[in-house]
Amino acid sequence: MTAETSTKGKKSRSNKRMTGDKSAPSKGEQAKARIISAAESLFNKQGFDGASMRDIAAAAEMQPASVYYYFESKEELLWAVWEKGGLELLHRVADAIANKTDPWQRMETACVAHTTGLLDWRRANQALFIMPPWHYPESIRARVIALRDEYEKIFIGLIDDLPLRKGVDRRYLRLTVIGALSWSLFWFKKERDTPASIAKQMLSMLRAGIED
């Protein structure tokens, strides 16, 4: 190998490090993902109080010490689960409406994305997203509320743009829409409905009574 070839090889490897090779997650990222996935499942089956860190470690096929290496407490692990789902849902809705311009089409698209996202991630959402914020540990409560508020800002903007008849309270409309769609987590039957059909039917019924 010539000195020039060796130098080129070093530069190539250096460039990869500088730009970041995102072809595969690191071992640490894989381990955290396994822990979060195990926690999602156990928080849903056993509840937050019922699932111990030892249980989560066993489900992730890891030692308890390894779980604590990545998450200093069960509360921080709960936040990781909530943040993962919350950000996925936020980005799903934001991306879905990005190229839409008609106010009602944007609203319908957001409702479909919201419902689809909740039902795609159903096992954890039943235990997490329906839980009132005051039920969360105090150490993470403010973060949960902040992320929830950031998500709801999307719907605040969408509803502000809708042509509604006089007297319709837009805050109540937002709470009604998000609440009704989210409750589908408990009664959804895939052999009977689709997430899109649920969202469209509910919004259509509301629209009939509120549109200007």
What residue ranges belong to the model's regions?
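Helix-turn-helix
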Residues: 34, 38, 42-76, 80
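Amphipathic alpha-helical segments used for helix-helix packing
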Residues: 118-139, 156, 186
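Hydrophobic alpha-helical connector segments
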Residues: 80, 94-120, 173-174
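Hydrophobic alpha-helical segments that form the core
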Residues: 4-8, 168-186, 197-209
